[in-house]
Design a protein with these regions (language model features):
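Domain-level recognition of nuclease-like catalytic cores that cleave nucleotide substrates
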Residues: 353-379
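Structural recognition of the conserved hydrophobic beta-strand(s) that form the central parallel beta-sheet
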Residues: 72, 96-102
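Hydrophobic anchor at the beta1->P-loop junction of P-loop NTPases
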Residues: 18
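Short regulatory helix/loop adjacent to the ATP-binding pocket of P-loop NTPases
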Residues: 105-120, 136
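Short glycine-rich substrate-engagement loop in P-loop NTPases that contacts/grips substrate
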Residues: 40-70
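Accessory nucleic acid-recognition modules appended to NTPase machines
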Residues: 157-315
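Conserved lysine of the Walker
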Residues: 26-27
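Pre-Walker A adenine-sensing motif
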Residues: 1-10
Length: 379
């Protein structure tokens, strides 16, 4: 059993949109936190059908409920019209809702009622290291951090089913059936570009579609919680920085499956990419769970200097190296960034055995970095 970091009970008195990709553990968390509340699960066909036919049923069933009671609606994006009824019940009966979903895209596209700011927004991420007793870094790098994938020895069949279900659901939702092959190809190309700067034109050529279509495909991945676009950090004066975003899938296991990566040995390029992805994944979750206003960006100059992770307005710069001994050549990007931001905290996360400091750069073993991250000592 994993003890999740997200604490929805701290939002008592407010309604909440709880978003998160499929199988991140949203439903399990809600069952654990609120075992006895009224719950509507729109994944159940009979529940979906009756509310789809008549959304007003929700108001009729809840109009006289005790306002102190919480109501959960799972997969709210399946019937956007229900949000009008939710809005009325919140405004006129002071009922508190948790509205759970795996995709905000349908709601955005149909201009659904997003409750006018009356509901807080929370995101459920895959598991993080602080939630797992006896966390195994190598296992996480290979399996990913979705609960059903991390716990098994070989998650390949579960990953295959996950990607298949996602494609079927999103292709159907987006009416992309005639473009199934191009979208599937796009997901594979996006995996090859994972952690790299996006060049839409090049990806479009590889997929056989237009650059605008590729931008729309990336938007689908973002709005269905399957990926993140991380912008470039450009607030530097001495060196020209690139603004094009990088893309990361929301979980390293997805990339491993799409690229057929397995049994990655430490010291190899593939292990290094997966190592960086997992750590970026943890930082994204940390920022999200702490509702931080600080943005995550990366820095790359036209001359080739790069830092994988910039926190805030240049306050912290973090690089990831999967080697077992960081040397000065591994810190060139950080030292170049220091010329722009002399007060920046400089960090390299690696497979070093012990924490140390080398010319103003803190070298963290990965496990120690993760421990200090979740102890609020990094960001």
């Amino acid at each position: 059993m994993y003890i999740r970091i997200l604490k929805l009970e701290e939002t008592a008195g407010d309604s909440v949109f709880l978003w998160g990709a499929r199988q991140t553990g949203k439903s399990t968390l809600l069952e654990t936190l609120f075992p006895s509340v009224r719950r509507y699960d729109l994944l159940k066909s009979e529940e979906f059908e009756r509310f789809f036919r008549n959304p007003a049923l929700l108001r009729e069933e809840l109009e006289n409920i005790n306002p102190s009671n919480l109501v959960i609606i799972d997969e709210i994006q399946k019937i956007p019209q229900l949000l009008d009824e939710v809005h009325w019940l919140m405004s006129n009966r002071n009922i508190r809702f948790v509205l759970c979903g795996s995709s905000a895209r349908k709601l955005i596209r149909c201009s659904a009622n997003l409750l006018g700011g009356r509901a807080l927004r929370s995101i459920m991420y895959p598991l993080v290291s602080a939630e797992i007793p006896n966390f195994d870094l190598n296992k996480a790098i290979h399996n990913g951090m979705l609960p059903r994938h991390y716990m098994v020895q070989n998650p390949q069949r579960r990953l295959q089913a996950y990607i298949g279900d996602y494609l079927n659901e999103e292709i159907r939702a987006e009416a992309l059936s005639r473009n199934l092959l191009s979208f599937t190809r796009f997901m594979e190309i996006a995996a090859q570009c994972n952690g790299e700067m996006i060049v839409y034109k090049n990806i479009a050529q590889d997929c056989g579609v237009s650059a605008n279509t590729v931008k729309e495909y990336f938007l689908i991945l973002e709005q269905t919680m399957i990926g993140y676009l991380i912008p470039g950090f450009t607030a530097t004066a001495k060196r020209k920085a690139i603004s094009a975003p990088k893309f990361y899938y929301f979980d390293v296991g997805i990339v491993n499956y799409l690229l057929k990566r397995s049994n990655m040995a430490q010291g190899t390029e593939t292990f290094g990419h997966a190592f960086e992805h997992l750590l970026i994944q943890e930082i994204i979750a940390y920022i999200g769970y702490n509702y931080s206003d600080e943005k995550l960006t990366y820095w790359r100059t036209s001359s080739g200097y790069e830092v994988s992770c910039i926190i805030g307005n240049g306050r912290i710069a973090i690089e990831f190296k999967s080697c077992d001994e960081v040397k000065s050549r591994h810190t060139k990007g950080l030292k170049a960034f220091q010329e722009e931001y002399p007060q920046a905290r400089l960090i390299v996360v690696s497979m070093d055995k012990y924490k140390r400091v080398m010319s103003d750069v803190e070298i963290f073993p990965a496990m120690e970095f993760l421990s200090e991250l979740w102890d609020r000592k990094i960001i």
